[in-house]
């Protein structure tokens, strides 16, 4: 017997997007001082909706401390999602600190230094 296909192939993306929007509001209401200015970058939900990886970056604050605090608050946040989402299974949340913005800033700094040293070399020649 063939596996039953989902009636809406984009449903997983829609659920992930709604989770991201709702979590943004719920995290804003958290009072934990370890959580800095967090920006949710994306959410990946497993096909059975049992787990969700939530990728975030931090503008101000410590990323690792924020990750620990968010994972500790995961049950509270999941309960908040349960009240907002109208799906049978609300996923267990796994927060992952996304270092992409840090790496991009480091790469930009390296490029700027290389360009500056090259222009100094051209001026000396």
From Swiss-Prot:
Gene3D superfamilies assigned to the protein according to its UniProt record, in alphabetical order: 3.30.300.20
GO cellular component: cytosol
GO biological process, one term: maturation of SSU-rRNA
Organism: Acidovorax ebreus (strain TPSY)
A Pfam short name: RBFA
NCBIfam families: rbfA
Record bears the keyword Cytoplasm: yes
Keywords assigned by UniProt, alphabetized: Cytoplasm, Ribosome biogenesis
Keyword Secreted: no
InterPro entries for the chain: KH_dom-like_a/b, RbfA, RbfA_dom_sf
The protein's name in its UniProt record: Ribosome-binding factor A
A Gene Ontology molecular function term of the record: ribosomal small subunit binding
């Amino acid at each position: 017997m063939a596996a039953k296909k989902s009636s809406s192939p984009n449903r997983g993306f829609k659920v992930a997007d709604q989770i991201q929007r709702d979590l943004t509001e719920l995290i804003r209401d958290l009072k934990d001082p370890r959580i800095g200015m967090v920006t949710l970058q994306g959410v990946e939900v497993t096909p059975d909706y049992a787990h969700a990886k939530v990728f975030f970056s931090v503008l101000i604050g410590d990323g690792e401390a924020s990750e620990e605090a968010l994972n500790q608050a995961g049950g509270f946040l999941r309960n908040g999602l349960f009240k907002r989402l109208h799906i049978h299974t609300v996923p267990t949340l796994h927060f992952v600190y996304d270092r992409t913005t840090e790496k991009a800033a480091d790469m930009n700094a390296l490029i700027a230094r290389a360009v500056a040293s090259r222009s100094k070399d051209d001026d000396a020649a």
